[in-house]
A protein has these predicted regions:
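Active-site anion-handling motifs in enzyme catalytic cores
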Residues: 1-379
């Protein structure tokens, strides 16, 4: 093992309300640094830099909203919700970032030379299609030739890659020394691009549950169901009127996902919270039941060994179901999916056998860790 190895993690990192994005950054950094003695950090990168005049206008607009919220109530509520979530505090204390921010590939080349290895992923970094040449950075086309280039649990966010750019995908993937993807669909796409890849776990699974338990806060005093529902417009998208009748607890706590504010009450009868990272984890860890449309909502339900129900999305967001179904299929948990031929009550009656799940998960985790560590220490 190469203690002190310098590793640059290249992934999505800017969100102020995406719990999964932030926790996968935390998990990969923690695994490499605290459990394996490396010096890994998330590379701060933007494709472009906003002109100074635009940044000044945005700052003035923010000040005016505080002085007079009625100017734009929805924008004001959005700012307030982000402050309540307070991702900045979690990132400051729990995630290491590069000391400088790179704007564009030229600056990225200047600062990335210090790393012994570069890792792209996790998250849907390869959903950034290669018909835009700027997106090749997610295939690590920067730095120097001596650096190891690894993808860890990278996701395409697609079942089928556009055929007109599959040749360019081959070129970009061929640059990488070691390739792993988060979904089985990703393995298929890599095969069609003419490269081999390994199916691995999301980095949040690399850590023991005890690591996350150290982040937990005091739980609510009474029993509750936790709802973490993304990418719906109204209750009809998940048949909420009928679903609400089947949920046993009187208290339902909900956290809106990216793009929603506290003023947007999507589902009646829910107590909404703009949770911090720690409170979001707490709400999952102590819930009687988790109901979610989210990949990381499912992930942390499994990590904390909770009863959960996954509701597949419909319409234009339906492709995002694939990453969840890939994971559930691997762990023999597809009976937790609220398909149209099942009811919530039917799923609720069948308790998750976490002894069997953890046996499968441990083997998959060992395979994932072996891939990552072998890739990093290979000569």
């Amino acid at each position: 093992m190469q203690k002190g190895m310098e590793v640059g993690i290249f992934t999505f990192w800017t969100s102020k309300d995406n719990y999964g994005q932030t926790l996968q950054c935390f998990a990969l950094k923690y695994f490499l640094n605290h459990q394996n003695g490396m010096n890994a950090e998330v590379i701060r990168y933007y494709a472009t830099k906003l002109p100074l005049i635009v940044r000044i206008k945005n700052a003035v607009k923010r000040i005016l909203l505080y002085i007079c919220p009625s100017i734009n109530r929805s924008q004001y509520e959005n700012i307030k919700s982000l402050e309540e979530r307070n991702f900045a505090k979690f990132k400051k204390y729990h995630i290491k970032y590069s000391s400088s921010t790179s704007y564009g590939k030229i600056e990225l080349n200047k600062v990335s030379g210090k790393y012994d290895a570069l890792i792209t992923g996790s998250d849907q970094v390869w959903s950034m299609l290669l018909d835009n040449p700027d997106n090749s950075v997610y295939y690590l086309d920067f730095g120097n030739k001596k650096q190891k280039r690894i993808s860890y649990a990278a996701s395409f966010g697609l079942q089928v890659y556009p055929s007109n750019i599959i040749g360019e995908l081959h070129n970009q993937l061929s640059r990488l020394d070691y390739i792993s993807v988060r979904e089985e669909d990703g393995v298929d796409i890599c095969n069609k691009a003419g490269v081999n890849s390994v199916h691995v776990l999301d980095p949040t699974f690399l850590l023991d549950k005890k690591i996350y338990e150290k982040l937990l806060k005091s739980p609510p005093a009474i029993s509750y169901t936790f709802m973490y529902v993304l990418n719906i417009q109204d209750g009809d998208d998940i048949d909420w009127n009928n679903l609400r009748k089947e949920i046993a607890t009187s208290l339902i706590i909900g956290t809106n996902g990216s793009g929603y504010t506290s003023s947007q009450v999507i589902l009646d009868g829910i107590v909404y919270e703009n949770s911090t990272i720690e409170k979001w984890l707490t709400n999952i860890a102590y819930a009687d039941m988790i109901v979610t449309t989210s990949f990381h909502g499912v992930v942390f339900s499994i990590i904390f060994e909770k009863e959960f129900v996954f509701i597949p999305l419909k319409g234009r967001h339906a492709p995002s179901n694939n990453r969840v179904l890939s994971l559930l299929n691997k762990l023999d948990l597809t009976d937790r999916v609220l398909f149209e031929n099942r009811t919530f009550k039917q799923i609720e009656k069948n308790k998750v056998d976490y002894e069997k799940v953890n046996h499968k998960l441990d083997r998959f985790r060992s395979k994932s860790i072996r891939f990552l560590m072998d890739s990093l220490i290979a000569k």
